[in-house]
């Protein structure tokens, strides 16, 4: 991920410079507002786990939320601070392992993350920490996909091949251009979630941690660009939305 930081940052910079920042911002803000009606953004503590070059942290800080952003990789955090510009002082950036969050219990009202869970070595441990740091009544928003399932599943492999064929005759950019695909596949082979049926796996685990969770398997239709839809047609993004029980409920 250290080597990917500059390239990944470029992708985030494009998102920040286009309508994607509005699409993603509205998608997240609507769910936060539904969970905390009447509360102003400045009173809501948000943790962005695996912030990477800072896309979520930046758009949420711009909306006025109290934002803390963590990433395991120092170079990603450097890119995030650079991308944040004048907003950098409004975001609490910290280098931290997503599987071992060093925050006190109940520190945040909202936890957001995107394309992180799939590459964790112990995602169940991560979920235990994520739910621990959420305050009672807190909201979890996890945007992810079953990335690299084609390494283990024949049907997914056929879908991946179709994606590459359709991409070759399209007018959109290949998202893998400049990416060390072998290195990314090596990561996927060492982590457990590319082999799992998701988001069903996530919902089962979160239930064990007392989180009422549901999955929106069509969220990709709202948040993905044409380019993303063609590149990743066989691996659609889903949203896991979880709610931690309130004090009276627990």
Q: What is the predicted role of each segment?
A:
Residues 124-136:
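A short glycine-rich, Lys/Arg-flanked "PGG" loop and its adjoining helix->strand segment in the class I
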Residues 193-210, 215-216:
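Short alpha-helix
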Residues 1-42, 55-59, 139-177:
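Conserved class I S-adenosyl-L-methionine
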Residues 99-110:
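A short acidic, Gly/Pro-enriched loop at the edge of an enzyme's catalytic core
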Residues 45-49, 53-100:
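Class I SAM-dependent methyltransferase SAM/SAH-binding core
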Residues 209, 226-250:
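Core SAM-dependent methyltransferase catalytic element
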Residues 110-123:
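A short SAM/SAH-binding and catalytic strip from SAM-dependent methyltransferases
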């Amino acid at each position: 991920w250290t080597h990917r930081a500059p390239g990944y940052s470029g992708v985030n910079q494009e998102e920040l410079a286009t309508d994607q920042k509005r699409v993603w911002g509205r998608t997240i803000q609507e769910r936060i507002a539904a969970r905390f009606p009447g509360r102003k953004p400045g009173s809501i503590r948000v943790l962005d786990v695996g912030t990477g070059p800072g896309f979520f942290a930046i758009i949420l800080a711009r909306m006025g939320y109290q934002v803390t952003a963590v990433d395991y990789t120092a170079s990603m955090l450097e890119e995030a601070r650079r991308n944040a510009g004048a907003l950098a002082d409004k975001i609490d950036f910290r280098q931290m392992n997503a599987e071992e969050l060093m925050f006190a219990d109940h520190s945040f009202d909202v936890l957001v993350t995107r394309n992180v869970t799939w590459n964790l070595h112990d995602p169940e441990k991560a979920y235990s920490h994520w739910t621990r740091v959420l305050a009672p009544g807190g909201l979890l928003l996890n945007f992810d996909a079953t990335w690299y399932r084609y390494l283990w599943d024949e049907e997914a492999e056929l879908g991946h091949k179709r994606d590459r064929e359709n991409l070759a005759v399209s007018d959109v950019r290949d998202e893998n251009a400049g990416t060390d695909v072998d290195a990314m596949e090596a990561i996927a082979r060492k982590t457990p979630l590319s082999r799992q049926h998701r988001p069903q796996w996530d919902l089962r685990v979160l239930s064990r941690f007392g989180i009422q969770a549901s999955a929106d398997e069509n969220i990709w239709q709202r948040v993905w660009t044409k380019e993303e839809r063609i590149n990743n047609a066989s691996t659609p993004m889903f949203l896991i939305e979880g709610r931690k029980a309130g004090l009276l409920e627990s």
